[in-house]
C-alpha cells in the first residue's frame, strides 16, 4: 500500500514545478507529560517561567482549547505525525506499537514537495518489549524515523540515542549508529535541531523536535534548577528546571531562525503530547490547573495541553484562539502549505485560514477519542465521556463547573445525540464499536476523579450492573466500610482482625500505593496520626487539598521516614493548611505490604475523622 502511494506522489512531484520559495519551513515541537498549567502565558500557576514560549504566544497564536488524540505518549505521537486518528491503524495505547510502515508520516507527505526532514528526541513509535505481539523489539531499527521518510534523525529520549548524523551534521557510516552525549537531554536535542536548521536554511524543511521533558526521570539540571523557587517540593522544582531548559532551547531556535532570516518563512507549532500524570510519587512534577483529570483520562486534564503556533507576518500576533483544535491539524496544515492536493485520509484541517479570519466558524464540529476502555466526543459546548459500559459523564464545558458536574440527568437528549455521533465514528474504526469491558486502571482514574471533584457518575441500581461489576462494587463497598472511609489506590486495602493491610500492585512503574479520604471538612492545620508495621523501610507522604483548590499541588505535601520493624510504629504528620481541608492522600513506597491501624485526622477546631 505504501509503495503505491509513494509512486503516485512521485508522479505528482515529477509533473510539478520545483519547490516554491513561498513554501514555509515547518517545525513541530512536542513536549512530554507537559501539563496545561506549565506555560506561563496560561496564567494558571505563578511559579512557572517560560519566557521564550511566552514570546511565541505573544508573537503568534495561543490555542486555549488545543487537544491531542490520546492521553498517552505512543498513540498521541502516532496521531500527530500521521494526521490520522491512530485507531485507524491499531496504535490505540502504549502497548499497541509500532507505527505501521504503511502509514504516511508528515515527512513522507512533504518529501515530493521538495522538503528535507529531520526527527530529534523521543520517537516512541518503534517496537518495544511491551509490543512484541505486533512486532519484535529486536527489529526496532526497521521502524526508526529513517524508515518513515526522515532524512536525518537523532532518535532517543535520554543521553544515548540512535542517529543518522553526528551532532555537527556529519553523516555516520552504516546508520543508525548509537551515540552518547552526557549533557542534559534538552541540550543535545536543541543542538541537533540547530545543526539541521543551519545546514538546510536554503531549502524547505520539516523538523519534528520531540523534547523528552518534563517526563520522568525527573532531574535537576543546572543552571536551571538553581533558579527555581527554593520553597517548592523537590519534584516540582525539578519539573520547572527541566521545562526551563526546554524553553531556553526553544529560545535558541527562535533566535537562529531570526539570524538566518527565516522567521517570516517558518511556521512553528508547540504542543504537549498529553496532560500531566498523577501527582504522587515520582510523577508529580507538572500541573494541569485548572483542568480536571490527568494523563490516562479523557477529561481535559489528560488531552488538553499547551498548544501554540507562530509565523510572523502571516499569523496574527498575540491572538488567543478559542474554538477547539487538535494535533491532527498539524499534518493537514503542513500539507496545504506545501502545495499538496487535498487528501481525504488526513483528518485534521488547515488552521491558517481560520486563525487569519479568512474562514468563518470553527475548524471542527466534533472531536473524538477512543482509548482503552474510555471513549469521548465534544462539540462546541458539550463533552460526553463513556467509561466502558459502566458509566457516562456529560459535561458542559462552557459552564463554570466544567468537568466537575455531570449533567447527564439534566440534558439526556444532548447526551443521546452525542452518543449516537460517537457510535457512528466508532463504527468506522477497526475494530468497530466502543470498548465495553472496563479497564481496571481506568476505573482507578475515574474513581479518583469522582473523589476529587464530587462529580456524580451515572446513577444505576445494583441490578443494572453486570455480575462482575456487581461483585466488584460489593467488594469495594465492604472494603471502604471496614476501612472507615479510607480507599486504596494502586493497591488493595483489606481488614483482618482489626488491622488494615495495604498490599501494593507490582510492576507499575512510579505508581506507588496510597490511601485516600474525601468528603472531609477539617479546619487547618490538620494532623495525621497512624500506626504501621512493615518488613521494609520507607517514606510516608501526606498530601492534601482545601476547598479552594481544584486539585492537589506539589506544595501541599509532608513526609516522614519509617524503619523496617515487626513492631508497631507511631507516625505523626502535620499539614500546615489554611482553610478547610476536604481531601487527603497518604502515600506509601512500593513495599509488598504494610499493616496499618488507628489512622486518625484531626483539624484545628477539634474536628476529627478516624
Model regions and ranges:
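Bacterial N-terminal signal peptides that target proteins for export
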Residues: 1-8
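Formylglycine-dependent sulfatase
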Residues: 10, 14, 20-388, 392, ...
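Predominantly extracellular/luminal cell-surface or secreted proteins
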Residues: 271, 310, 543-547, 602-604
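Extracellular carbohydrate-recognition regions
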Residues: 466-490, 610
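Short carbohydrate-recognition loop motifs
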Residues: 491-510
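Extracellular ligand-binding interfaces
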Residues: 504-577, 588-595
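Extracellular beta-strand-rich recognition modules
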Residues: 582-588
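Exposed low-complexity, polar/acidic, P/S/T/G-rich flexible segments that act as propeptides
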Residues: 591-609
Amino acid at each position: 500500500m505504501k509503495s503505491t502511494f509513494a509512486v503516485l506522489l512521485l508522479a505528482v512531484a515529477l509533473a510539478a514545478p520545483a519547490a516554491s520559495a513561498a513554501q514555509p519551513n515547518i517545525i513541530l515541537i512536542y513536549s512530554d507529560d507537559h501539563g496545561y498549567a506549565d506555560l506561563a502565558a496560561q496564567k494558571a500557576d505563578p511559579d512557572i517561567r517560560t519566557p521564550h514560549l511566552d514570546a511565541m504566544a505573544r508573537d503568534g497564536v495561543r490555542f486555549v482549547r488545543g487537544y491531542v488524540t490520546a492521553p498517552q505518549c505512543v498513540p498521541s505521537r502516532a496521531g500527530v505525525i500521521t494526521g490520522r486518528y491512530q485507531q485507524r491503524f491499531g496504535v490505540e495505547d502504549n502497548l499497541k506499537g509500532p507505527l505501521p510502515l504503511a502509514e504516511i508520516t508528515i515527512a513522507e507527505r512533504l518529501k515530493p514537495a521538495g522538503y528535507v526532514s529531520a526527527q530529534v528526541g523521543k520517537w516512541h513509535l518503534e517496537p518495544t518489549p511491551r509490543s512484541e505481539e505486533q512486532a519484535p523489539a529486536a527489529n526496532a531499527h526497521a521502524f526508526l524515523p529513517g524508515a518513515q521518510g526522515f532524512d536525518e534523525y537523532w532518535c532517543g529520549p535520554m543521553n544515548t540515542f540512535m542517529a543518522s548524523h553526528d551532532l555537527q551534521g556529519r553523516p555516520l557510516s552504516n546508520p543508525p549508529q548509537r551515540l552518547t552525549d552526557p549533557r542534559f537531554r534538552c541540550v543535545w536535542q536543541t543542538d541537533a535541531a540547530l545543526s539541521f536548521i543551519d545546514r538546510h536554511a536554503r531549502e524547505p524543511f520539516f523538523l519534528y523536535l520531540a523534547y523528552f521533558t518534563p517526563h520522568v526521570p525527573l532531574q535537576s539540571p543546572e543552571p536551571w534548577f538553581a533558579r527555581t523557587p527554593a520553597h517548592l517540593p523537590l519534584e516540582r522544582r525539578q519539573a520547572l528546571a527541566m521545562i526551563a531548559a526546554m524553553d531556553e532551547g526553544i529560545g535558541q531556535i527562535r533566535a537562529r531562525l531570526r539570524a538566518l532570516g527565516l522567521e517570516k518563512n517558518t511556521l512553528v507549532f508547540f504542543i504537549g503530547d498529553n496532560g500531566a500524570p498523577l501527582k504522587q510519587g515520582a510523577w508529580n512534577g507538572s500541573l494541569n490547573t485548572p483542568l480536571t483529570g490527568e494523563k490516562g483520562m479523557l477529561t481535559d486534564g489528560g488531552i488538553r495541553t499547551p498548544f501554540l503556533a507562530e509565523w510572523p507576518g502571516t499569523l496574527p500576533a498575540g491572538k488567543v484562539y478559542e474554538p477547539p483544535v487538535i494535533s491532527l491539524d498539524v499534518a493537514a496544515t503542513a500539507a496545504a502549505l506545501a502545495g499538496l492536493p487535498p487528501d481525504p485520509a488526513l483528518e485534521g484541517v488547515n488552521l491558517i485560514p481560520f486563525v487569519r479570519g479568512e474562514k468563518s466558524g470553527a475548524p471542527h464540529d466534533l472531536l473524538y477519542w477512543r482509548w482503552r476502555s474510555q471513549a469521548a466526543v465534544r462539540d462546541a459546548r458539550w463533552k460526553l465521556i463513556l467509561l466502558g459500559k459502566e458509566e457516562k459523564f456529560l459535561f458542559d464545558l462552557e459552564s463554570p463547573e466544567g468537568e466537575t458536574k455531570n449533567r447527564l440527568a439534566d440534558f439526556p437528549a444532548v447526551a443521546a445525540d452525542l452518543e449516537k455521533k460517537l457510535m457512528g465514528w466508532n463504527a468506522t474504526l477497526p475494530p468497530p464499536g466502543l470498548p465495553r469491558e472496563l479497564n481496571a486502571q481506568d476505573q482507578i482514574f475515574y474513581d479518583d476523579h469522582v473523589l476529587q471533584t464530587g462529580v456524580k457518575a451515572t446513577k444505576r441500581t445494583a441490578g443494572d450492573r453486570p455480575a462482575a461489576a456487581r461483585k466488584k462494587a460489593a467488594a469495594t463497598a465492604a472494603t471502604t466500610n471496614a476501612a472507615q472511609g479510607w480507599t486504596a489506590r494502586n493497591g488493595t486495602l483489606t481488614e483482618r482482625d482489626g488491622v488494615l493491610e495495604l498490599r501494593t500492585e507490582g510492576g507499575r512503574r512510579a505508581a506507588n500505593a496510597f490511601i485516600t479520604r474525601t468528603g472531609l471538612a477539617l479546619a487547618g492545620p490538620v494532623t495525621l496520626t497512624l500506626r504501621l508495621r512493615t518488613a521494609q523501610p520507607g517514606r510516608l507522604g501526606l498530601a492534601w487539598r482545601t476547598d479552594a483548590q481544584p486539585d492537589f499541588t506539589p506544595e501541599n505535601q509532608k513526609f516522614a521516614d519509617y524503619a523496617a520493624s515487626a513492631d508497631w510504629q507511631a507516625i505523626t504528620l502535620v499539614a500546615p493548611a489554611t482553610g478547610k481541608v476536604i481531601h487527603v492522600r497518604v502515600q506509601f513506597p512500593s513495599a509488598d505490604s504494610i499493616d496499618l491501624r488507628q489512622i486518625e485526622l484531626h483539624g484545628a477546631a477539634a474536628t476529627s475523622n478516624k
